[in-house]
A protein has these predicted regions:
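Transmembrane beta-barrel wall of Gram-negative outer-membrane proteins
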Residues: 24, 243-270, 280-320, 352-372, ...
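Short, acidic, small-residue-rich periplasmic hinge/interaction motif at the N-terminus
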Residues: 30, 44-46, 75-79, 89-129, ...
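Extracytoplasmic beta-strand/coil segments of soluble accessory domains associated
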Residues: 137-176, 196
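Short acidic/polar hinge/loop motifs at secondary-structure boundaries
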Residues: 138, 175-203
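Short strand-turn segments of transmembrane beta-barrel domains in outer membranes
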Residues: 207, 217, 222-255, 266
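Flexible loop and strand-edge segments within Gram-negative outer membrane beta-barrel domains
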Residues: 271, 277, 282-284, 302-362, ...
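Outer-membrane beta-barrel signature, preferentially recognizing the C-terminal barrel domain
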Residues: 336-359, 502-534, 540, 546-605, ...
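Gram-negative outer-membrane beta-barrel transporters
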Residues: 601-605, 609, 614, 622-710
Length: 736
């Protein structure tokens, strides 16, 4: 495959012969709503240093052009940007229509490229520079509707409209992240300092990134070349008080006018024990290292680019979370706050996580005249996760969990974008995964050896119905095949009835254990439609989607102690695919003095795969809660809100809130790990004459989550009586 890919790339990048360069492109730029000319619009040729401004009559002229194919970029300060392909064989006259509206910085953005309009919420690199003390998931909460599921000082996952893990896709530099996202304690392997910008994709277009994005898609924007000889270097040093954390980040970028570009970004972050009001929390330090290198060559109608990144994190886990006997477990879970132990130190000991992630990709594109743009991409990822528990003797140096996941991905898509009022895009993608759990740990493997093959294809279309109305639609189908090798205890295999339902999976019977080779296949179909209305700063988008999600390996095969979670997790071979039906409405208003955004949603998920507390298990290593993957029907209902008032060009006030309710319909009970009602308020003052200087005063309040499942009533052999294990109880509301 790699030789075919290299051959295609070499064909894509073959240079064209020199031509006579005396042609012109002239025309007008018109306001799409009222037909009036737009003055000051930038008309440029993508990939070349040719750009002009439209005059007061909206007219422009580009001169000295060769015969050939060009992509014309038209933009205006108050409008979205368009990219229009043109085949130039003679002097050409064109009229371009721009949708004139006031955009609010870092709020709901209307992004238009080749008439591809999709509602997204965005944050740029400047926002992330102010969030360097936080991890990636925490920084994402600047986007309304994203909360976090936080299980440690440096361990947090994005939680979108009540769902997380495999239901929220993270697309990094055009690559879907494969970093064992199924674990609640598995944070995204992305350094906050490496992010150029992030957008949240919802609606029909989001199906391009995957058919299982029940919550949505978090898209990390790739670096864009500037097509001129330039270089830029930036250095950031940040420190923060809790944990005496420090972070250093360096970035260098180099661009050439011929479209070549390259860069390098590196960062290092270290913090010691955090503290609460009573004292230091032992073993809550962290250490992170990241480096990324983008490079490539972009022209107007063809290009190639590559990206390589490495991320490594050593995250301490609160020492108190290491459980001994049952009474220890009850005391720790029922306690209001963790008991501080020890003094401040940067040392990180067991229990801890040691995680690394490598990502590499190469992609190429070619724009065919009068047809569209074809893109090919290959990517590789390797994720290593080691989880260390407190063990005796030399075994303390060995991880209790040692997992490696390799992913090879290939994708191809074609975008038919020669028409102004419609767009069609289709593509295929495939991924092959090899999962290896190292048996040298001496501990039963939580997730077995498996190979996972995914194949997906999608079709997307957009139609401009009128200057104010647009319709999007997409369909997608995916096929998933998982082949595993796993040992089961004979007693458990029989108790679950697997000996009857899955007898063909048995390879060998070793009396007390059974070696099996499960082979499971799932075919999923997804569809989504989005209708957009936009006029005079008001925008309403309605999204209707049906999504099927195949179970992930953890939901199927988990069996054993998940060390970083300090619990036993059990999967089920009987898992069926989820079926989610979602209706979401987004309304936004943008004006010079204020912006407003509100988004109610309802998501009905049949056969929802939930990890539920189910009891306790006593082992030679102590007592641990048992959590089981179970299927039920679920309703997720919520609303996200954000309002910003601009008092002056430099002073603004922002208020936001998120509410989500989740109900287990079969058991008429709430789900665990659902975020409470949260609000935030921020007063921000920038200084026009001092570039880069701003002051923010922010407060966040999280209410107490009262809608939780019932706690477990267990028998305590030490006291010889039943005792309540408050495993689902939520903390009181708090203000930060």
């Amino acid at each position: 495959m790699k030789y075919i890919l290299l051959l295609l790339m070499s064909l894509v990048l073959t240079l064209v012969n020199a031509q006579d360069c005396h042609f012109i492109i002239q025309g007008k730029v018109i306001d799409q709503h009222d037909g009036k000319p737009l003055e000051g619009a930038i008309v440029a040729i993508y990939g070349l240093q040719k750009e002009v401004f439209s005059d007061k009559n909206g007219q422009f002229i580009l001169q000295g052009l060769c015969q050939g194919f060009y992509e014309i970029e038209i933009s205006h300060i108050d409008c979205g940007t368009q990219f229009i392909p043109i085949k130039l064989e003679k002097n050409t006259s064109k009229t371009f229509y721009l949708e004139h509206h006031v955009e609010a910085l870092n709020e709901v953005a209307l992004i238009k490229k080749a008439t591809n309009l999709i509602v997204q919420q965005t944050i740029d690199a400047t926002v992330f520079e102010n969030k360097l003390s936080q991890n990636f998931a925490e920084a994402l909460t600047e986007i309304q509707g994203i909360n976090t599921l936080k299980t440690g000082n440096a361990i947090a996952k994005p939680l979108l409209q009540g769902v997380y893990g495999s239901r929220v896709i993270t697309n990094n530099q055009g690559v879907r992240m494969q970093d064992m996202e199924w674990g609640a304690e598995h944070a995204p392997n992305i350094a906050t300092s490496s992010v150029e910008g992030v957008s949240l994709a919802v609606g029909a277009k989001a199906l391009k990134y995957g058919g299982d994005a029940v919550g949505g898609v978090i898209v990390l924007d790739p670096r864009k070349p500037v097509f001129k000889n330039s270089q830029k270097h930036s250095a950031i040093f940040t420190t923060y008080t809790n944990g005496l954390g420090v972070l250093s980040s360096q970035k260098f970028e180099k661009d050439f006018e011929n479209g070549l570009f390259y860069g390098i970004q590196a960062s290092y972050k270290k913090a010691g024990n955090n503290r609460n009001a009573a004292g230091y929390l032992q073993n809550t330090g962290l250490e992170q290292t990241s480096i990324s290198i983008p490079f490539g060559w972009h022209l107007a109608h063809k290009g190639i680019d590559a990206y390589i990144s490495y991320f490594k994190a050593n995250n301490g886990i609160l020492r108190n979370s290491h459980i001994g006997n049952l009474q220890d477990l009850i005391n720790q879970i029922n306690r209001e706050t963790a008991i501080p132990i020890g003094a401040f130190t940067y040392n990180i000991e067991n229990p801890r996580q040691d995680v690394s992630h490598v990502l590499a990709k190469i992609s190429a594109y070619y724009h065919f005249e009068d047809l569209g743009k074809w893109t090919l991409q290959y990517d590789f990822q390797q994720n290593n996760r080691k989880e260390y528990d407190v063990r005796l003797g030399d075994r303390n140096k060995l991880p209790g969990t040692d997992l490696q996941l390799q992913t090879h991905g290939f994708q191809s898509n074609f975008k038919l974008d020669t028409s102004y009022d419609k767009l069609i895009e289709f593509g295929i993608e495939t991924a092959y995964q090899i999962h290896f759990p190292n048996p040298a740990t001496g501990v039963k493997r939580l997730i077995p050896d498996y190979n996972n093959l995914n194949f997906g294809t999608y079709l997307y279309g957009l139609k401009t119905l009128s200057p104010s109305w647009e319709l999007e639609g997409s369909i997608r189908t995916d096929w998933v095949q998982i082949k595993a090798d796993k040992f089961y205890k004979t007693s458990r295999w029989t108790a679950l009835g697997y000996n009857t339902d899955f007898s063909d999976f048995i390879v060998s019977d070793f009396d007390t254990q059974i070696l099996t080779a499960p082979e499971l296949s799932f075919n999923t179909q997804s569809a989504a439609f989005s209708l957009h209305y936009n006029n005079l700063g008001h925008r309403v988008s309605t999204h209707l989607q049906y999504i099927e999600r195949a179970p992930n390996p953890a939901e199927l095969f988990s069996e054993g102690l998940h060390h970083s979670a300090a619990r036993i997790e059990l999967g089920s071979l009987r898992m069926k695919k989820e079926k989610a039906q979602k209706l979401a409405v987004q309304y936004s208003y943008s004006a010079a003095q204020r912006t407003f955004f509100i988004a109610p949603y309802f998501n009905r998920i049949n056969d929802y795969m939930a990890l539920i507390p189910a009891g306790l298990e006593f082992t030679i290593r102590g007592a641990f809660p048992v959590w089981e993957y179970q299927q039920t029907n679920a309703n997720f209902t919520g609303i996200d809100f954000k309002w910003t008032e601009y008092f002056t060009d430099e002073l603004k006030f922002t208020n936001g809130a998120s509410i989500v309710k989740a109900l287990d319909l079969k058991n008429n009970s709430p789900f665990p790990n659902i975020p409470p009602v949260s609000t935030h308020h921020e007063l921000s003052q920038s200084f026009k004459h001092i570039k880069g200087l701003s002051v923010q005063l922010r407060g966040d309040y999280n209410f107490r989550q009262n809608e939780v499942p019932e706690d477990l009533l267990i028998f305590n052999p030490y006291t010889q009586r039943e005792q309540l294990l408050e495993i689902n109880r939520a903390p009181n509301g708090y203000f930060l």
